[in-house]
Swiss-Prot record:
The protein, known as: Transcription factor bHLH18
Pfam families, sorted: bHLH-TF_ACT-like_plant, HLH
Organism expressing this protein natively: Arabidopsis thaliana (Mouse-ear cress)
PANTHER family with a match to the protein in the record: BHLH TRANSCRIPTION FACTOR, TRANSCRIPTION FACTOR BHLH18
Low complexity composition-biased segments: 207-222
Gene: BHLH18
Length: 305
């Protein structure tokens, strides 16, 4: 019995040793799992004496990972350790680390940004001043326009523009009517002047007399009666002459000599005479007065008798 009791502590001690060894193996395996590197490099040589870890073979020493900072610059790749005592950065240190031309570029960029901001502010103020001046001019012109419109009741811009348009249209119509009346008056005065005919005396000196005058002397009995009317470039010539062969052609020739182009002609026999109506146009070189046309036609046609 005593032997059995003596054997129990030994068995318990051996069990403790086994448990301790088992715990040691578990902790070793756990440390191996935790401390295994993130990437295993391939090797070309395999050692034949590679055995699994056991209690007799101690585990390899723990490898403490060290964090590093990669600094990318043009000079190359630099690796910095966090454990370094001088690992303190500031913007000034970064600027000091830049080359001189980089610093100059940064300074130029900052200057350009400041200048562009100043220019944009000055441009905005100039635009505001220009817009203010433009509105002042526009207001002044509206005031001046409203002073020219008679009977203006409202002073707002829409009313001023509407009444101005109406007044301008009224003035245009008045000008057209005035021009038409002026043309009619000019035509009447031309007709009165052209109704006078020229009579040549015995000395071939022209003397004016009315075409409606029935008292004719013997020297004017054979002369044709001439009436001329002018409207712009159009000339209407009416001639009453004796009925003779060739007179019509000769009369047209005399008219063309004066710088007139005949566009239409009409000849009607009236008793012993011809009533000739001719419409002609002034040429570019025509610069004669109405009286001169009558005189030259009378003098040229007097040779026909």
């Amino acid at each position: 019995m005593n032997s059995l009791v003596g054997d129990v502590p030994q068995s318990l001690s051996s069990l403790d040793d086994t448990t301790t060894c088992y715990n040691l193996d578990a902790s070793c395996n756990k440390s191996l799992v935790e401390e295994r590197p993130s990437k295993i490099l391939k090797t070309t040589h395999i050692s034949p004496n590679l055995h699994p870890f056991s209690s007799s073979n101690p585990p390899p020493p723990k490898h403490q990972p060290s964090s590093r900072i990669l600094s990318f610059e043009k000079t190359g790749l630099h690796v910095m350790n966090h454990n370094s005592p001088n690992l303190i950065f500031s913007p000034k240190d970064e600027e000091i680390g830049l080359p001189e031309h980089k610093k100059a570029e940064l300074i130029i960029r900052g200057t350009k940004r400041a200048q562009s901001l100043t220019r944009s502010q000055s441009n905005a103020q100039d635009h505001i001043l220009a817009e203010r001046k433009r509105r002042e001019k526009l207001t002044q012109r509206f005031v001046a326009l409203s002073a020219l419109i008679p009977g203006l009741k409202k002073m707002d811009k829409a009313s001023v523009l509407g009444d101005a348009i109406k007044h301008i249209k009224y003035l245009q119509e008045s000008v057209k009517e005035y021009e038409e009346q002026k043309k009619e008056k000019t035509m009447e005065s031309v007709v009165l002047v052209k109704k006078s005919s020229l009579v040549l005396d015995e000395n071939h000196q022209p003397s004016s007399s009315s075409s409606s005058d029935g008292n004719r002397n013997s020297s004017s009995s054979n002369l044709p009666e001439i009436e001329v009317r002018v409207s712009g470039k159009d000339v209407l010539i009416k001639i009453l002459c004796e009925k003779q062969k060739g007179n019509v052609i000769k009369i047209m020739g005399e008219i063309e000599k004066l710088g007139l182009s005949i566009t239409n002609s009409n000849v009607l026999p009236f008793g012993p005479t011809f009533d000739i109506s001719i419409i002609a146009q002034k040429n570019n070189n025509f610069d004669m007065k109405i009286e001169d046309v009558v005189k030259n036609l009378s003098f040229g046609l007097s040779k026909l008798t």
